[in-house]
Amino acid sequence: MLKELSSVQAYLPFIHAMLADPDFRDPMLATPAQLHQHLLDAHEDPAKRLFGTFDGGTLTGLFSVLVLPEEGYLQLLAGLSRQAAAYDALLSHLQAAYPGYQADFVYSPRSRLLHTALADRHAAFDPEQQKMFLRSPPPYVPDSRVQLYTPVFRAQYLALHDDDRYWTGERVLAAQDTFRVLLAIEDDAVAGYLDLTYRNAENEPYDLFVREKSRCRGLGRALLSCAIEKNRPIAMSLRVDSVNLAARRLYASLDFVEKPEENNITAHLKL
C-alpha cells in the first residue's frame, strides 16, 4: 500500500540502513546536504511529495518526488526500497496522479528493481554517468578566450546550447541563483560554454560543450580551469558519460578522481 507522508522523521533507521547498503543506496542522497534537501527536509517544500509503501504495518519503501505542475514535470529525488512491488506502486501512482507529465528518475546502476520497473513502462535511458570529484587541481593559468556570460552573447549561447534536457539554455539564464555561465569566444563568436552551479556546499560543471570546429584547441580545458578557479574554495564534483573516455581523461588531467560507487543512470518517462 502506498501512502503520502507528512514527514520521514519516524523512519530514520530505515533510511540509514538503506544508505549503508551498496546495492540499494541512492546517489541522490550521497551527501548530508542532499539527504536533507531531497528527503529529510522535503516536507518543508510545497513542491515536494513524500510517499511510503507498506506491507501491513511494515515500511517497505520511501520516496521523495519533486512536482512542478506549471511545467508538467516531476523528478524522483529519493527512492529507497528492496522490493519491486514498492517501485511498481510508486510508478502506478505517479501515472494515475500526473498523466502527461514528463518524469525523470536518477538512480544507481545497481538499482535493478527500479530499472526493471521503468523498462517495463518503456522509459528511455541515458548512458551511465561516472561521478568524479575534484581533488587538488594544478595552478590556474588564465585564458583570454574565456569570460563570464554577458547578454550580448545571449542569442549565440542559446543557439549552441544542448536543450535535450530539463536545464535548457533559457532555464539556465533564468536561474541566476543557481548557475553562472562561462563562455569561450573565438573571433567574436561563442565557441563553447560551461554552465556552473554555485552557492552550494559542492558545485558542479553541469554542462560543458565546445562546437565541433573549435575542438582540439584547449577550449574545454580552459573553460573547466576557469570554472575551478571561480569556484574556489568550494568543493566541486561532476558527472560524465562513462563511455566518454576523452572527457574523462580531460577531467582526470585537472585532478578529478573517479568515485564509481556514486555513478548514476537517468531515465525519462512520459506518464
Model-derived features: positions:
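Conserved active-site alpha-helix within GNAT-family acetyltransferase domains
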Residues: 109-127, 221, 243-260
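Short amphipathic alpha-helix that is part of the acyltransferase structural core
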Residues: 1-34, 129, 138-167
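Conserved hydrophobic beta-strand within the GNAT/NAT acetyltransferase core sheet
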Residues: 103-107, 205, 236-240
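Active-site rim helix/loop that mediates acceptor-substrate recognition in acyltransferases
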Residues: 27-50, 161-193
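Conserved donor-binding loop and adjoining core beta-sheet/short helix segment
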Residues: 30-89, 194-206, 212
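Conserved acetyl-CoA-binding loop-helix of GNAT-fold acetyltransferases
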Residues: 83-96, 210, 216-229, 248-253
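C-terminal "cap" of GNAT-fold acetyltransferases
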Residues: 127-148, 239-245, 258-271
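Acyl-donor-binding surface of acyltransferase catalytic domains
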Residues: 70, 78-142, 265-267
